[in-house]
Amino acid sequence: MQNQRIRIRLKAFDHRLIDQSTAEIVDTAKRTGAQVHGPIPLPTRKEHFTILISPHVNKDARDQYVIRTHKRLVDIVKPTEKTVDALMRLELAAGVDVQISLG
């Protein structure tokens, strides 16, 4: 495990949830003796939707909505056995999507 790297990508619609989850991951990794690079904020994806609120006429009556997808990246360099075990047992918020890759 000494020469490997764990890359964790987090996605969420709520920036507070993703920041809280990232802090938990960084604290857990540092507590177990691994080096941590990050959290690195990645570009936020914004999706814009415009919806007509009038059923028939009044083309000017519209609502606009935005969905923001926040992303963070955390690299764990030189993870130990304790680091992997602690990350597997870690409970994160339900609104956060986590992708883990070994490299």
Swiss-Prot record:
InterPro entries: Ribosomal_uS10, Ribosomal_uS10_CS, Ribosomal_uS10_dom, Ribosomal_uS10_dom_sf. PROSITE patterns: RIBOSOMAL_S10. It comes from the Bacteria. Involved in the binding of tRNA to the ribosomes. Gene3D superfamilies: Ribosomal protein S10 domain. GO terms for molecular function: structural constituent of ribosome; tRNA binding. SUPFAM superfamilies: Ribosomal protein S10. Part of the 30S ribosomal subunit. GO terms for biological process: translation. This is Small ribosomal subunit protein uS10. Belongs to the universal ribosomal protein uS10 family. One of its GO terms (cellular component) is ribonucleoprotein complex. Keywords: Ribonucleoprotein, Ribosomal protein.
